[in-house]
Amino acid sequence: PEWLEHFGQNEEGNLRRQAISMSIDRKTVAEKIFHGTATPAVDFLAAPISAYSKELKGNEVLKYNPSKAKELWAKANAISPWSGEFGIAYNADGTAKNWVEAICNYIKNTLDIDAKSIPMSTSDEFLSNVDSGKMTSAYRSGWGPDYPSADNYLVQLYDSSSADGKGGNSGNYKNPEFDAMMDKALSAPSTEEADKYYQQGEEILLQ
């Protein structure tokens, strides 16, 4: 979430999010941890959704590139030196332990920082901290759409109208440019035109 120190909606925060993302070998995690049952993401949507695209501008940040990750992290440090640890919280009564630990190891080894998993005993404890905005670290998240449409992913998870406990935007991400794209998509006269706006919104998220 953007309320964490060093991860605001600014140049430093963008650089650090990109660096962390490019530190993770999603392909290996999908193969070794999920035994081939998961697919590395190239989009914020599932493949059957009409707005899904493998060609989004900026989606290179979703690809494993440790040398670029180190470069971006160094640029962020030039703005504000990193200190402390990077943690990813998860509920220990679920199935996230192995993949969260794997991701933390990638981040630790690539960026040479203290990165660790943070288990919370139960789903209730975990969700209570997420819903109340009390998380003091990054945390695992998941989403199952109610219906197969881009808005049920993007509006629910990233639009300002779904922040502050009003929807699935638990990280309280707020970006007027993104919101404007969602408004245009929702009022578009055709699916094809709506999908173009959804994709432009996703490209904002990838920045």
Regions found by a protein language model. Give the residues of each.
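A bilobed periplasmic-binding-protein/Venus flytrap-type ligand-binding module shared by bacterial periplasmic
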Residues: 1-16, 32
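Sec/Tat-exported extracytoplasmic proteins
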Residues: 23-28, 33-37, 49, 73-80, ...
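Extracytoplasmic/peripheral linker and loop segments enriched in polar/acidic and small residues
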Residues: 14-18, 22, 30-31, 114-125, ...
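Short, solvent-exposed loop/turn and secondary-structure capping segments
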Residues: 31-35, 43-44, 99-101, 150-153
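Structural transition elements
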Residues: 5, 39-76, 93-98
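Solvent-exposed loop/turn segments at secondary-structure junctions
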Residues: 2, 26-29, 36-40, 49-52, ...
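Generic structural signal for hydrophobic residues
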Residues: 16, 20, 29, 69, ...
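Ligand/substrate-recognition segments at binding pockets and active sites
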Residues: 74-145, 170
